[in-house]
Amino acid sequence: MKRRRYVIGILLCVTALLQAQDSVKSFDEFFVAGMDKIDGVFPVYVAEKEIYLEIPEKYIGREIEVSGQIDRGFDLLNRPVDGLGVVRIISPDKATICFQKPFYTERILDEKSTYQQSFSLSNMQPAGKSYPVVAYSKEQGANIRITEYLMTGDDWFSYNDNFIRSLVPELSEIMKIHPFKEGVSFTVRRYH
């Protein structure tokens, strides 16, 4: 019985892996007519109501900060909210980007250190939140769909105050995309 479960589990994993590999589009299929590209450190692609973030290849393995704030509403002005925080961008395969929240009791910042290999083996990290790669840009940057994380999700930032009503997702919208020297910011209007 256990052997049958293992075989079924392996078949499911192989099927999921093959589906994930087929889901990555070519850049020409991805970049449709009417799509705009906003250049920056992390280029952003906008097509109608869909937002895609490009993770350049040189940022795989690096850390970024994901945070948010309420600018106004509910008697809150410029109030920080719970954000994803500092995450490491990893790519376990060509079809996935993960935001890993590293947990270290100690760190080695020099990647050429003689202790780096033993340190990485003794500090295995959880995979983190994974995002399917939609397409790769001509510069080999991985494009991930981030629309729902900005508009309705609470993965990247959340606010759990009792006086904030429930979200009305169909009225929420992206107001502005602002690339700057170190990253990109989004102004999102969420209706509650």
What function would you assign to each model-found segment?
Residues 7-8, 34:
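Homeobox/homeodomain signature
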